[in-house]
Regions:
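PLD/PLD-like phosphodiesterase catalytic module centered on the HKD motif
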Residues: 1-169
Length: 169
């Protein structure tokens, strides 16, 4: 059954995300967000590092349009590669509209949890803004999860007319 996350009234998305990553249920974490700032990454970094050190995989896509992503926040995410299997793709395309998704996917071999909402990886997006998200549990083979995976893949693929680059520290 889908769950509606209403921040800050009932949930803080940052706490929810930290709890999910620390639960040791998931082997892969993917996210695509419009903006990331150190104000957000400082809350997530210890748990993201532990997730990687426990054998998890992280694949991130971050937009840099409209100057809302900070260098420091991006640098934090890029540094994750030193702790395990982590990639960060930077999305920037001067010829198109702003990259603006907020899509999170936690998965393992038998289960997937998709979260679609308005939360960026900023302190305000994770904790203080009025934000909403819809959480859907399904299998990795379900149509909605396959469609989400296809979206992640297309945003990482420069052959689809999208300017992306994978960075590492």
């Amino acid at each position: 059954m889908p769950v509606f996350l209403n921040q800050p009234i009932a949930h803080r998305f940052g706490k929810y995300l930290l709890d999910e990553l620390a639960a040791e249920r998931w082997s892969r974490f993917q996210a695509a967000v419009a903006w990331v700032r150190r104000s957000g990454t400082r809350h997530l970094m210890p748990t993201l590092r532990a997730f990687l050190q426990g054998g998890g995989e992280i694949r991130l896509i971050v937009g840099v349009d409209i100057a809302h992503t900070s260098f420091e926040g991006l640098e934090d995410l890029l540094s994750l590669a030193t702790y395990g299997s982590a990639t960060t793709h930077v999305f920037h395309n001067e010829d198109s509209a702003v990259f603006h998704p907020k899509l999170y996917l936690l998965s393992n071999a038998t289960a997937a949890r998709l979260v679609v909402g308005s939360n960026n990886i900023t302190e305000s997006g994770l904790y203080t803004n009025t934000e909403v998200a819809l959480m859907i549990d399904d299998t990795p083979q379900s149509k909605v999860v396959i469609d989400a995976e296809a979206s992640f893949d297309s945003w990482r693929d420069p052959l689809h007319g999208i300017s992306t680059q994978e960075f590492s520290c």
